[in-house]
Amino acid sequence: MQLQDEAYLPDVARAEWALHRCASAPDRLADPASLTLLTTLEPDALRLYLAPGCCIVRSDWPVVSILDAHLHGTPSLAEVGAQLRASTPQELVVWRSGLRPVFRQALPGEADLLSALLAGVSLGEALDAAPALDFGQWFPLSIQSQLVLGVHHEI
């Protein structure tokens, strides 16, 4: 077996590189008081502060499962093998929580939202780019996990 026969390896390398780069991303402090802007301004006038090193890795392969199996022991390697044979696509979200790089599988629509936010658009535009996202589910999770650190008003 040659490495070139393992089509998923470049995506796993991109995911591992994202985790590595995340570890040395510049620090940013959370600003929980800024969340009140969500109650007073329209989403088109707001931007979200994302955690250091935040990025998305989109893959035609089960990169999240591969990383989880190797780093956390679950799912089993047999389960990952089945996902590889089925070419199960996954989207990986990477960010730093405190000083620790973390990752998880993206929620439906989350990769579209984060890609738009990382491109510098307003929250309103990002929400338009992610119609599949349940923002009511995603936002509390993103605050609790320190993926979103605050909100600021676009000038």
Which residue stretches match the model-derived regions?
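Long, charge-rich, low-complexity alpha-helical segments
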Residues: 1-40, 99, 104-155
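N-terminal start-of-chain detector that recognizes signal peptides
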Residues: 26-30, 46, 65-66, 86
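Low-complexity, glycine/alanine/valine/leucine- and proline-rich hydrophobic stretches
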Residues: 50-119
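A general structural signal for short secondary-structure junctions and capping/turn motifs
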Residues: 11-12, 44-49, 83-85, 140
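Short secondary-structure capping micro-motifs at structural edges
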Residues: 40-44, 78-81
